[in-house]
């Protein structure tokens, strides 16, 4: 009679652990998809609006645009950081060439790295502390006129109208 009681308690303990653990999996960073938002780029030809996925958690920033096979010209991914710091990126498991636009805390472009090599493990670093990185399909930074000093507007930078 002792064994059924122990087995019952063990089963109850396992169920309790699973009940406590499963909601964390369902709502953890790894399970969430990036939210989509808009940015406005002040270009020489006028304001351009782009749709961007927001990568604002460690898990979303780590995954980035990995495993994607295409990125529309009117979209990108905006990596947001709590504090300005030197940022290092790479192209591991990223199948499409990208332009990386490093952004200061006020939303101005610090520098642009163009034509990154898909799946490369080379480190792509910002030359100065930045608060965000905008990734676009390769060639789009030039098409949009993104260069040092260009303003990118988004509520994160406190400069959205």
Predicted regions span which residues?
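Bacterial N-terminal signal peptides
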Residues: 12-23
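A general, composition-driven signal for non-globular sequence regions
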Residues: 1-3, 21, 42, 55
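Bacterial N-terminal signal peptides that target proteins for export
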Residues: 2-13
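Sec/Tat signal peptide C-region and signal peptidase I cleavage site
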Residues: 24-28
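Compact, glycine-rich, soluble single-domain proteins
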Residues: 29-161
